[in-house]
């Protein structure tokens, strides 16, 4: 009687290495960023998809503070594009690990906060618990229409959920980065 080698195998749980998890987190986060930036470019060029029936997609920059805010956001876009790639590419090792880690944690926190606050704002308005939501603004002040269509409301919620997804991905990247550093025995 012959025995096959498969009969002698033991099943062990399949676990991914910390580096594989980091690479997957970095790639997923980078794809999210590319889509995020593509939509913003589309909206800056006048596109309306994703905003429902709202008359304007990007408010005009009327003062210096708005222009400075836009420059800060542009800087965040640039950092948010570089960091996910730097996590798992060799050139990323030139960037101190703590900077990459903090960028992931801060980006994940801000995106999650923005996304979840938007969802909560919509829920409070939709249920009638707070007619002006968390912002204190009416629909007309926020969207340009007093009675937005379901399409507009769903579009706004989809954008909020996309922000929250970005937050989750950056937080995943932060955790994976920490695990990868510990597995390599580096803490700095």
Located regions from the model:
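Individual transmembrane alpha-helices with interfacial aromatic-anchor signatures
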Residues: 23, 103, 140-166
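C-terminal TM-helix exit segments that contain a strictly Trp-centered aromatic cap at the helix terminus
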Residues: 35-47, 109-131
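Core segments of alpha-helical transmembrane spans in multipass integral membrane proteins
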Residues: 64-86, 105-109
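Hydrophobic cores of alpha-helical transmembrane segments in multi-pass inner/ER membrane proteins
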Residues: 73-82, 158-173
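Loop-to-transmembrane helix junctions at the membrane interface
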Residues: 86-109, 113
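Cytosolic juxtamembrane helix at the C-terminal end of the final transmembrane segment
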Residues: 88-92, 127, 168-188
